[in-house]
């Protein structure tokens, strides 16, 4: 990986965009940390997208990602990619299927534009069984060093495991 990263940096022909998505506790953060260990972190830009800010709500939906895209020759890692909000909003009943379809169409157009501009997009979905997800949530919750990571929304999403898997 390190050699490939330096080849990318030297050629500066295209940016690499890595999307890490998946169920809660599947290891997205750990995967990002490993990539930082295996490659030169000076040339990796990592972004963990959370709740929309007031400014982001006033802008087009892809703006928050657009401004964080890596330049040619660099790597950008996104946790909580542009797929996260549309999927969670649909699973939690905040949007209907028709709106999800529209959002997915916008995402496809966004990714197509990035690819047409030469970007390489690598998308990874990290999965856990429902049982293993529950075990990891409980383990994180019990440990005083990691309990802060488990929020009410994590348990709310866990209860919607089957619906999220279908979407």
Predicted regions, residues:
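Glycine-rich phosphate-binding loop of ATP-dependent small-molecule kinases
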Residues: 2-167
